């Protein structure tokens, strides 16, 4: 199946003709594996190395430190993709995007791995000892803490969580099919003169459907796990994404489009659907006009 915008995307990678483009897929895969391994290690490293009072003191912070480090580095690399634009264009011209894409394809997989990480318990590899009571408390579902294990609760949360997972994935696939890999791959951040203004109706209800998808994907994990850790991880992810959207991407859009984009910001929410627009959004997912 041919991906929309693939030709335009590939056109801006002049040193990677034909199958050489697979380098970027391998780079993303390696980045994701490294990020995942780091998170798994940080989830249990203090439980593995420490004991006694030191275990009780430091173990609860291991998973949080792991998420914080990967999130910081991931968003930093994505920021560098935007930050280095002018210098790279001046120095490399038509190869600027190709050079910058390396930053994005290391950073973005780490952000995606953070979302996947929310779906899994922190003791998946290294068990929590009986004396590590704070870590155990943070990793248990909130309902389990108060009412014990309840099959109905687990079932309802799982159904809703997997529904959100489906909505997030479906939103990404719909966005990709409509706008193409060239837009999703941020080619026109570097070459805006080649782009076309997008007028799809989805932009009348939400400014950043892709980021909405990422929020929804991660929220599905929160409902499935429903632990204090999952809520903390989700909060950290929201903060990182919002800082990036508001102070990196939208700053660039304001420079490009000026007051017209500021007016658009006032009329349409960035990543949260208004209740009145839920029906329209579902039509978008089902490939129907509003």
Predicted segment positions?
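Membrane-anchoring alpha-helices and their flanking helix-loop junctions
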Residues: 1-196, 218-290
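Active-site-proximal inter-transmembrane loops
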Residues: 187-211
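Conserved beta-strand->loop/alpha-helix structural units within folded catalytic cores of enzymes
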Residues: 214-215
